[in-house]
Amino acid sequence: MADGVDHIDIYADVEEEFNQESDYPVHDQIDLYDDVISPSANNGDAPEDRDYLDSLPAPGGNEGSKGAPANVVYTYNGKRIALYIGNLTWWTTDEDLTDAIRSIGINDVLEIKFFENRANGQSKGFALVCVGSDSSSRKLMDLLSKRELHGQNPIVTPCNKQSLSQFEMQSRKSTQSGQMSGEGKAGPPGSGSRGGGFPPGKGQRRFPGPPGQGDRFPGPVGPGGPPPHFPGMQGPPRLPSGPPGPLGPPGPPPPGQGLPPPLGGPPNRGDRPPPPVLFPGQFGQPPMGPMPPGPPPPGYGPPPGPPPPQQGPPPPGPFPPRPPGPLGPPLGLAPPPHMQGPPPGGPPPAPHVNPAFFPPPGNNMPSSDGRGPPPGDPYGRPPPYDRDFPGGRDMDASRTPLSEAEFEEIMNRNRAISSSAISRAVSDASAADYGSAIETLVTAISLIKQSKVSADDRCKVLISSLQDCLHGIESKSYGSVAGRRERSRERDHSRSREKSRRHKSRSRDRHEDYYRERSRERDRHRERDRDRERDREREREYRHR
């Protein structure tokens, strides 16, 4: 290597590189540690970010931090204190929580994260709130628990694993209790018995309540419409939305009917439309694209909630209530085939009645006799079902008294059916065709029971005689089957005995043959030995000579 070449000193800048560590402040490490403290949810349920409050204005003391670069997260004096706020309703939004926090004089909220169920996206009832100072955290723990939020007092706890496990356990218990009761969690204000409500102008925008008993068609909802309701979910069913028809003059709701079930679901956030629903394509309708903000699709309602209250005046609304009287179908609209629950215009279900099992008769379905439900049933349920009672047109005919000639004609027909069935069944049973005999008797019994005179004593005598014959043939068929089984068992036993005898005889023969063969082998060996001895003696004699 030439002497003129300059040697490179690779250790020249080592001290400068080590001295660069002093350029980084120590509190950044503390911030990283504080960030690690904020835990995630158990069972893999990380806190789902509802809406990050990026648009919150910074407090007056930190105006100078606006010029910081975008990747700098902590601009509040290097502090980031996390707290848990629980005992919230599942429909509480981050806006509601932010308003409640601001109402107690705290303006340095950095972040709000709601814990949600991964299965349905519903809030678990508690959230992680980060504030920027110790004084704000102390004020939050002291004052927020005294404020009422949707009828419940929030619980503020420090951010640790013990508090997280307590809130998780509380959310699981509430979910299990809601599933056991069959009603889900408590619904939003206006659908439960709690007195917590929304401030004026806010609840009406998010919860469009129908004014009258039959006026269940809400107008256009605000930007945040209620989410769609999938078939099979519990709660008051949603009905087809559309423009209201002529509703008549205003009047009080019908007697016995209180506030109709609210149609609005939980308050949706105003900056997001409801998620698109593509289920109607399964019912012969064209698939729907993403739904714009507005009224929800027909047949969908809120998530599980309690049944509607049965007392109280109707809420104020844009439509006047209907006068009391019979309610007809609304403008020819019929409920879709996949919708469960009462049809449009029917009374709301009672708290103890499941509308899936007790649907009241639809007003848009024509009745067979023009008469309505019995007057004693307030929910319009059909009369109890009687097994021996004919259905359809025979039911109407059975109400009208029969003439003597018709009665005798039907009785003669039943007698002929009974006698022919018994004779044919006996002949089939004698030929050991028990299945055909039993089928004949069962058919005859069902025909006589379906006749118009089945309640008469003479018909009952015919039915009892047919049933006695049926029981006798059944017992005989069972006895014959048992006899066949016994015979088959005896045959199997005899066959098995014969097989065992043959096997024993074969085994004896095999043993005898084996012993014979062994004795022959021994004799052969003895003969060979004797021959060898003789040969040896001869050789000896020959040598001695």
UniProtKB/Swiss-Prot annotation:
Residues 184-200 have a biased composition (Gly residues). Residues 81-161 form the RRM domain. Residues 37-69, 165-404, 478-545 are annotated as: Disordered. GO terms for molecular function: mRNA binding. Residues 384-397, 483-497, 509-545 have a biased composition (Basic and acidic residues). It comes from the Eukaryota. Residues 220-230, 237-265, 287-363, 372-383 have a biased composition (Pro residues). It is found in: Nucleus; Nucleus, Nucleoplasm; Nucleus speckle; Cytoplasm. Keywords: Cytoplasm, mRNA processing, Nucleus. GO terms for cellular component: cytoplasm; interchromatin granule; mRNA cleavage and polyadenylation specificity factor complex; mRNA cleavage factor complex; nuclear speck; nucleoplasm; nucleus; paraspeckles. Belongs to the RRM CPSF6/7 family. This is Cleavage and polyadenylation specificity factor subunit 6. The gene is cpsf6.
